Amino acid sequence: VNPANRNLLQGSGTSRAIYQAAGEQELTAACEAIGRCDLGRAVCTPAFGLPAKYIFHAVCPAWHGGGFGEAEQLAGAYHSALELAAEYHCESVAFPLLSSGNYGYPKEQAFRIAVDTITQYVMEHDLTVYLVLYDRDSLAVSRKLFASVEEYIDDHYVAQNDESYGFGRRCRELSERRRLLEEDAALPMLGAVPAPAAAPRTA
């Protein structure tokens, strides 16, 4: 998932890295063909040179103090990209921590929104989701909050849904998957199964 602006122009940081890896000319042309995307929404392009099928461009809010609908817009960007992943029959999708870089969203709040939105979605959809953390501050926040995330899932989902949907198994996998934070700062969140060593091309 590319953290995008409304004009779908190449940004800095993660966005620049995605454009360079995919092929700037091809990806720029694909985004220009789409034109614009509303804040809190996402659009899809081919992945071109990236080892994935698609790139979902999620238009993220900048932080203006929290009183301008930023939380709803950020949750919407995650949800829209997740809906695209389902629409395009993806088995997995990887997100950076949206809006937490140059857009200035406080990392702890950004992480909570990411986890809450992704958790609610994957409880009803068979999709493996990775939240990729690039810096020490984001990793520190994730370590601080992850135990409370597991407790929240247990309290709100497992008891009533375990028999029908196997959510208990999904949640038990969280303990093992948290270990990946210590290894490579990539957090696979609540997917139906752990990603295999030779995983299929992902979005």
Residues covered by each model-derived region:
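Glycine-/small-residue-enriched capping loops at alpha/beta junctions
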Residues: 2-87
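Phosphate/ribose-phosphate-bearing ligand recognition and processing surfaces
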Residues: 62-199
